[in-house]
């Protein structure tokens, strides 16, 4: 019996030792995977500037976002910022302020801690425009939360489709006889045919009659004017 008890105690001790060793290994793995430990964590540094405005007037309401809200930083009273515990990778750094707009910057961090800053180009993603590091982020103006209401102008009235449909035919009727040689009967006949082709509604007046009256009235006025001039010349003689 004492030998059996001694063997059982030795077995329990060895089992407990194995369990302790296993727990130590698991805790070591958790320490390596934990976000706050390890030497592969870096910091993103920079400065935000608003031209003509003191940093004390706006830094209290601003935040620095790295990769969305994955890492959040705050600005000091001089406009500088440091975001700690950022692993290696490629991140978009933004300064968010309700009163000022800042362009985002992409920061690439290598596994050895080398930093590279460049413009964020959503159209040409392969184009790389280097920026200095630590970051120097300058405000581009106030954010545009609202769209300016459009004002009414004369161009809006003139470019209205209904107005153009009313004005253009009138201009054609008035200016076309002055440009085209109306004394030519063939030209007049072609114009009447083309206008009749456009007039598809039978309830509307005949365009050819209108054109004939217009041209004949002009030609008769010209002939009467020339006749009167000839009579006046004859009387003078």
From Swiss-Prot:
Gene assigned in the entry: emc7
The protein's role, per its UniProt record: Part of the endoplasmic reticulum membrane protein complex (EMC) that enables the energy-independent insertion into endoplasmic reticulum membranes of newly synthesized membrane proteins. Preferentially accommodates proteins with transmembrane domains that are weakly hydrophobic or contain destabilizing features such as charged and aromatic residues. Involved in the cotranslational insertion of multi-pass membrane proteins in which stop-transfer membrane-anchor sequences become ER membrane spanning helices.
Organism of provenance: Xenopus tropicalis (Western clawed frog)
Stretches the record annotates as Disordered: 216-237
Pfam families membership: EMC7_beta-sandw
UniProt record similarity statement: Belongs to the EMC7 family.
Intracellular or extracellular location(s): Endoplasmic reticulum membrane
Assembly, per entry: Component of the ER membrane protein complex (EMC).
Lumenal side: 29-156
Biased composition (Low complexity): 217-237
Protein name per its UniProtKB record: Endoplasmic reticulum membrane protein complex subunit 7
